[in-house]
Amino acid sequence: MSGSNPAVSINKRKVAPVVLAILDGWGYREEIEHNAVRQASTPVIDALWHAYPHTLIEASGADVGLPDEQMGNSEVGHLTIGAGRIIQQELVRISNTVKENKLITNPALNQFSQSLKKGGGTLHIMGLCSDGGVHSHINHLCGLIEWAASKGLKSVSLHLFTDGRDTSAKSANKYINTIEAKIKSTGVGEISSLCGRYWAMDRDNRWERTSKAYELLTDPRFALSKLSAAESINKSYQEGITDEFIEPVRLSSSFLKDGDGVVFFNFRPDRARQLVKALKLKDFDGFERKNRADIDVLTFTQYESGLPVSVAFPPEPLNDLLGQVISDHGLNQYRTAETEKYPHVTYFLNGGIEKPLKGEVRHLVPSPRVATYDLQPEMSADELTDSCIKAIDSGIYSLVVINFANPDMVGHSGIMTAAIKANEKVDSCVGKLLNSIGKLGGSLLITADHGNSEMMIGPDGQPWTAHTTNPVPVILIEGEKRKLSGYGNDIKLRQSGGGLADLAPTLLHLLNLPKPKAMTGKTLIEPINLPKKPNLIPQPAY
């Protein structure tokens, strides 16, 4: 599937492109043990690392606007790359609000509670119950329970999605204990259902998964379990089912009915959209909805423009983004990824802008229809590479951005052999890309948005399925037609202090475009020490 843009300008002379290849989840860790990056056979990237300018940059914590020691993720990573500056992320923004007890003054939440009390409906709070900090945080859920208590809401049902992907695979009981303690201390709420995120938080249009979560929430005939939340989780473990895949289970008689209200506390949109659309959209064709309730929905952040929901923390607009600079200078750009990472190279890289910019073409390659990607670690990398090469060969794009999902999506499986195969496939694809770029004299900048597959076993000896706080590599292969004036063959990359926010300024430097003042990141290309001469033409400050 490809997106077209009639505003793309066609130039008879082929353009030497600058290509940004994002190897999603390809972090750097020196140790070889349990490291699917180091253990993979990657002759292309190994050779480029040794032969061309390279460095390591930070992709987690404060360097991407997250709390210290908080692992990075694809949304935050691409947002930071595209913005060229460090942005306070939603995790920090909402955490500060909860910490300062300011949920009680949030206008959207207060209007929501007033409407709910007036109608006498039940408040249903749902979302990912963990401290992973990628899609949600348990502190936000605790804050919501306290908010509900402060507003005098008596009928409160919690529908909790178990993690096991951004956390340890069998850690759900720890979070359930925290929530049960909060329920006891406030006297508000009950855990009404449990469901693994595999079912409730799909983002790949696997509607058969979303429908199972939907039925759990809406079907009055859904079987009521006699087990407690903890007992249900332990039963799943006994059956070999970890947190991510826990089957939907109803723990109380509460389900969504007309006049009820839902607060969805995930702050990251991509894995919350499908379920919200199923719950709220009138025109919906993902699956047949047998039990549609007339409910109000409030989401913590804007999951998608145009959704008929209230938003507690609306987006803060960003300007002077990488894509906008390219577009404003009349240049064409191409963005491509497979399904799992398509929103990241488009929506997130553009700072939350839904529609393509002038001169921007987007191309989606479908991800394979498998239960988990360790079953097909190559994913759709070959098809993705072939489509990107066609775009490069067309000679009409100044900037090309491609995301390889394999290291991250297969890394999440925790299966070492599969992650190694995934990384080897990406390495071979980078080689094909480089050959195509070289024919036009273009430049290639290789990096990652966060770490993952470089650590497959955690400190507890269990499979590590989450992201990491490790740095990520950057390699610059400068093309003959993209040589920066004055550097010759002596171009070097900054060896310390770099982060994802420095990538947009670096790309603009390679494209010989000015960096906007709003971009506080700095080019990773080291300045050259030219002898002082009179009347030199001032150069842009990157």
Curated annotation (Swiss-Prot):
Task performed by this protein: Catalyzes the interconversion of 2-phosphoglycerate and 3-phosphoglycerate.
Reaction(s) catalysed (UniProt annotation): (2R)-2-phosphoglycerate = (2R)-3-phosphoglycerate
Lineage: Bacteria, Bacillati, Cyanobacteriota, Cyanophyceae, Synechococcales
Keyword check for Isomerase: yes
Protein name (database record): 2,3-bisphosphoglycerate-independent phosphoglycerate mutase
Active site residues per record: S74
GO biological process terms held by the UniProt record: glucose catabolic process; glycolytic process
InterPro entries given in the database record: Alkaline_phosphatase_core_sf, BPG-indep_PGM_N, Metalloenzyme, PGAM_B_sf, Pgm_bpd_ind
Binding positions (Mn(2+) 1): D408, H412, H467
